[in-house]
Amino acid sequence: VRDAYIAKPHNCVYECARNEYCNDLCTKDGAKSGYCQWVGKYGNGCWCIELPDNVPIRIPGNCH
């Protein structure tokens, strides 16, 4: 498990405005919790706590 930005296909973050949206998204994929990281490295994106290793995360490089 790891703490990371959860990724959509093509290495894009899930953009957000509310913590509840990210918490629901992250826990649905098996994370302990999640919140909306405002003005982070990739803008406003969902950050997950203890996200399982099999779930894609945002990695360095372009969002396609």
Swiss-Prot record:
Domain LCN-type CS-alpha/beta: 2-64
Primary localization class, coarse: secreted
One MF annotation (Gene Ontology) recorded for this entry: sodium channel inhibitor activity
Described function: Binds to sodium channels (Nav) and inhibits the inactivation of the activated channels, thereby blocking neuronal transmission. This toxin is active against mammals and insects. BmK-II is 6-fold less toxic than BmK-I.
This protein's domain notes: Has the structural arrangement of an alpha-helix connected to antiparallel beta-sheets by disulfide bonds (CS-alpha/beta).
Family: Belongs to the long (4 C-C) scorpion toxin superfamily. Sodium channel inhibitor family. Alpha subfamily.
Protein name as catalogued: Neurotoxin BmK-II
Organism of origin: Olivierus martensii (Manchurian scorpion)
